[in-house]
Regions:
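N-terminal amphipathic/basic leader segments beginning at the initiator methionine
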Residues: 1-36
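Short acidic-hydrophobic, aromatic-tinged amphipathic segments that line or gate anion-handling sites
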Residues: 29-38, 99-108, 206, 336-345
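Glycine-rich phosphate/diphosphate-binding loops that line cofactor/substrate pockets in enzymes
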Residues: 38-55, 74-78, 223-231, 259-261, ...
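Short glycine-rich or small-residue beta-strand-to-loop segments that form or flank ligand, phosphate
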Residues: 50-62, 82-85, 233-235
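Histidine-anchored nucleotide/phosphate-binding helix
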Residues: 57-80, 249-260, 267
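Anionic-ligand anchoring segments at beta-strand to alpha-helix junctions in alpha/beta enzyme folds, i.e.
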Residues: 70-100
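Conserved, well-structured core segments that form the ligand-binding/active-site neighborhood
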Residues: 99-237, 256
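C-terminal non-catalytic interaction/assembly regions of soluble proteins
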Residues: 250, 254-383
Length: 383
C-alpha cells in the first residue's frame, strides 16, 4: 500500500491508499540549479549602496535567494541596502545570514506611492517566486505590483478577463496589461523559477524581461499534460503561506481544475488558520455582497475572482475541502463539501465512483499546472 505524505498547514498528513486506487501522483519536473550556477546568477545582480529590495513572495526559495543575495552584496562591500516586504508577508520572511540585515514591512504610504518609494533609492530590485495566477495566468512582479500597489490598474485588469473561469498558464489581456504598466517602473526584478523544494532558474533584468522568461520556464517545467480524471486530491505544497488562508489555497485548486472530467471531484487541503484571506470572500460569506453585485461593481474587490470562479464552476465540478474554517462558511455559503480527514475523503470517493476508482494526487499544486486536451507549446504566447 503506497503511503503519500501531503502538507496540511504546518504538518504532513498521510494518504493511505491502495495501489489499485492510485492513478498517479502528479509532480512537475524541476532540474535544480547547481551551486555554482546559483552563485553566478546572484553575482550579476547590480545592487549598490542605498539600494532597495522589495520582497513579494515568502517561499523557501525566496528566503534562500534573499539570504544569499545579502551575503553576495556585503561580500562586495555594500553595507547599506534596505529590505522591505508586503504587509501580508509579516512573519514569513527572515534573513538567514551572518550580517546585520533585517526586513521591515512596507508602510501605508509606501503602498500608496510606489513611485515615490522607489525614488528615494539609487536602485530598486523586486524579488518574486514565479507561480500561476488564475486571473493573469502567471504570478510574478508585475501581477504583485498591480494587486498590491495599483488599485485602478487592478480593476482594469479584472475587466479585461474574457469569462469567469480560471486561466492559469495562459497569456491573456490582464497579463499583457500588467507587463505594460511595469515598463515605466524604474526598477529591476529577480524572478525565481522552481517548486516548493528546489530552484530551477533565476532571472534578473528588467521587470518585463524577467517575468516573460520566468513564465516560459515555469510552463516548460510544470505545465504537465494529463488525461482527464474523475477525482484529484490537492495540496498546495510545503510553502506555508499557501496553506494559511482560503484565498491562497484556492489558487492551487484553480491550477488543477482543468484536468477534471465533467462532474469530477477535487478535494483541497486548505487549513486556512489565518482565515478567509480576502475582502470579497469575507463580504460574500457574511452576506454583504453577491456574485451579481461583484460583477456589476466597476472596482475590483480583493479576492473577488474566487467567488466568481466558485459560482461559475459549481455546476460542472464538485469541490471539497479539509480545513479549520467553519463549516457554515465552507459548505453553506461557498458550496464546498467538508471533510475531517483524508481517510474520509478516500472513502467518499470510492463510494461515489466505485471500489476500483483511481485517484490523482497533486502534492505541490502551487507550482503545478496540469491540463488535458491543450497543446502546451501553443499556449504560451507573449505579446
Amino acid at each position: 500500500m503506497p503511503e503519500i505524505w501531503l502538507q496540511y498547514g504546518k504538518t504532513d498528513i498521510a494518504l493511505d491508499i491502495r495501489f489499485e486506487n492510485l492513478y498517479k501522483e502528479i509532480i512537475p519536473t524541476f532540474t535544480p540549479l547547481q551551486e555554482d550556477q546559483f552563485s553566478s546568477k546572484l553575482q550579476d545582480v547590480p545592487l549598490s549602496e542605498n539600494s532597495l529590495v522589495i520582497v513579494l513572495s515568502s517561499s523557501k526559495a525566496t528566503k534562500q535567494v534573499l539570504s544569499s543575495l545579502v551575503d553576495t552584496v556585503t561580500g562586495k562591500g555594500v553595507n547599506e541596502i534596505t529590505i522591505v516586504t508586503l504587509p501580508k508577508l509579516k512573519g514569513f520572511i527572515d534573513i538567514q545570514n551572518d550580517n546585520n540585515y533585517s526586513s521591515s514591512l512596507l508602510s501605508a504610504s509606501d503602498l500608496v506611492s510606489l513611485t515615490g518609494t522607489i525614488a528615494k533609492f539609487e536602485k530598486t530590485v523586486f524579488l518574486s517566486h514565479s507561480a500561476y495566477d488564475p486571473l493573469f495566468g502567471f504570478e510574478g512582479t508585475p501581477t504583485h505590483v498591480l494587486r498590491n500597489f495599483m488599485d485602478d490598474k487592478m480593476s482594469e485588469a479584472f475587466s479585461l478577463r474574457t469569462n469567469d473561469l480560471p486561466s492559469p498558464g495562459i497569456i491573456s489581456e490582464p497579463y499583457r496589461l500588467a507587463l505594460s504598466v511595469c515598463k515605466d517602473i524604474e526598477a529591476m526584478s529577480i524572478e525565481i523559477v522552481g517548486n516548493s523544494n528546489s530552484i530551477s532558474d533565476i532571472y534578473c533584468g528588467s521587470i518585463e524581461e524577467s517575468f516573460t522568461k520566468s513564465s516560459s520556464k515555469l510552463i516548460e517545467n510544470s505545465g504537465v499534460e494529463e488525461h482527464r480524471v474523475k477525482s484529484a486530491i490537492i495540496s498546495p505544497g510545503s510553502d506555508l503561506l499557501y496553506h494559511t488562508t482560503l484565498t491562497q489555497s484556492l489558487n492551487c485548486l484553480w491550477n488543477s481544475v482543468h484536468i477534471l472530467s465533467d462532474h469530477g471531484t477535487a478535494i483541497l487541503l486548505g487549513e486556512s488558520s489565518g482565515g478567509l484571506g480576502s475582502k470579497a470572500l469575507e463580504m460574500f460569506v457574511e452576506g454583504r455582497t453577491d456574485v451579481s453585485l461583484l460583477r456589476e461593481n466597476g472596482k475590483y474587490v480583493e479576492g473577488q475572482e474566487h467567488v466568481m470562479f466558485l459560482e461559475a464552476m459549481r455546476e460542472k465540478y464538485d469541490f471539497g475541502i479539509i480545513s479549520t474554517l467553519p463549516e457554515y462558511y465552507l459548505k453553506t455559503k461557498l458550496g464546498l463539501k467538508t471533510f475531517d480527514s483524508l481517510k474520509q475523503v478516500l472513502t467518499n470517493l470510492l463510494l461515489r465512483y466505485g471500489k476500483n476508482h483511481k485517484v490523482s494526487v497533486l502534492s505541490d499544486a502551487r507550482y503545478t499546472s496540469p491540463r488535458s486536451g491543450i497543446g502546451i507549446d501553443n499556449e504560451l504566447k507573449h505579446p
